[in-house]
From Swiss-Prot:
Tree of life domain: Bacteria
Protein name: Malate dehydrogenase
Record's catalysed reaction(s): (S)-malate + NAD(+) = oxaloacetate + NADH + H(+)
Family, as annotated: Belongs to the LDH/MDH superfamily. MDH type 3 family.
Keyword annotations: NAD, Oxidoreductase, Tricarboxylic acid cycle
Keyword Oxidoreductase included in the entry's annotation: yes
PANTHER family for the chain: L-2-HYDROXYCARBOXYLATE DEHYDROGENASE (NAD(P)(+)) (PTHR43128), L-LACTATE DEHYDROGENASE (PTHR43128:SF16)
Entry GO MF terms: L-lactate dehydrogenase activity; L-malate dehydrogenase (NAD+) activity
Top EC class for this record: oxidoreductase
Length: 317
């Protein structure tokens, strides 16, 4: 049986981690594209040379030609400028829109049957632009945001409660920005509501809410927290791991339920926009969007987040 093929567009920090993770998990052969001559070739050679050490068998190739992504099953797009301290994701829209336009044209011409996972920021606008230019079906063009935002939320909960992050279940909805919606009501530790555990820990409902509010705020600003600490770039380990989880679910038809930036056609009261919602990801890309009832407070936050997405998308020239 022929191996699957994964194409990575962008040879920066995220691209390098993506290539290594794809190889370690043996998801298929991997090709990395970048416009900088020598950069993708060097990174892929570096990773390939430890195949005997890490125990993986796959073909790794770096290239400066879009022709080499032909036959790809999944394309993951990281190309674009990263944030610097003091910048929001939205500040990148003008320059990264130009980059995404070129990238999407390259994908359309050379990998017309691929599933596309966009990581580039501002995410909600970039995935919208990518789908528009490629013309691919909505189920085949998605964005990575919710898996990472949810992972950050889970991490902060685990640290606060002193439990394994493996036992924490939590999710965010909405756009990939300061108005994202961490779902407090559905956060649990092995089925036990997190708010109940916080109330027992602090023996004070007001204090428990204060602690949760702080975790929600930190989740919303988590990407900026990393940017401020690094000073020269943005997060790259966590976005790469999150995108690989999505790609693996598609390539292996795992049907994982993952928060995904997906095109909505009336779900959650949103029509005609890409927004983060729980999706079943399988061999057909987005196979289901799992809709559920939001309470009044959650709906208000979701409406605010969607409004921010609409404004962002509308600002693209």
């Amino acid at each position: 049986m022929a191996r699957k093929k994964i194409a990575l567009i962008g040879g920066g920090q995220i691209g390098g981690v993506l290539a290594q993770l794809a190889a370690l998990r043996e998801l298929g052969d991997v090709v990395m594209f970048d416009i900088v001559e020598g950069l993708p070739q060097g990174k892929m050679l570096d990773i390939a040379e430890v195949g005997s050490v890490d125990g993986f068998d796959c073909n790794l190739k770096g290239t400066n030609s879009y022709e080499d992504i032909k036959g790809s099953d999944v394309v993951i797009v990281t190309a674009g400028l990263p944030r610097k301290p003091g910048m929001s994701r939205d500040d990148l829209i003008e320059v990264n829109s130009k980059i995404m336009t070129s990238v999407a044209e390259g994908i359309k011409a050379n990998a017309p049957n691929a599933f596309v996972i966009v990581i580039s920021n501002p995410l909600d606008a970039m995935v919208t632009l990518c789908q528009k230019i490629t013309g691919f079906p909505y189920n085949r063009v998605i964005g990575q945001a919710g898996v990472l935002d949810s992972a950050r939320f889970k991490t902060f909960i685990a640290w606060e409660l002193g439990v394994s992050v493996k036992d924490v279940n939590a999710m965010t909805l909405g756009g990939h920005g300061d108005d994202m919606v961490p779902l407090v009501r559905y956060a649990s530790v092995n089925g036990i509501p997190v708010m109940e555990l916080l109330e027992r820990k602090y023996k004070d409902k007001a204090k428990a809410k204060e602690v949760m509010d702080a975790m929600v705020k930190r989740t919303r600003g988590a990407g900026g927290e990393v940017v401020a600490l690094l000073k020269t770039g943005s997060a790259f380990y966590s976005p790469a791991s999150s995108a690989i989880q999505m790609a693996e679910s598609i390539l292996k038809d795992q049907k994982r339920v993952l928060p995904t930036c997906a095109y909505l056609n009336g779900e959650f009261g949103v029509k005609g926009f890409y927004v983060g919602v729980p999706c079943v990801l399988g061999e057909n890309g987005v196979e289901q969007i799992l809709e559920f009832e939001l309470d009044a407070e959650e709906q208000a936050m979701m409406d605010k987040s969607v409004a921010a997405v609409k404004e962002l998308v509308g600002s693209m020239k």
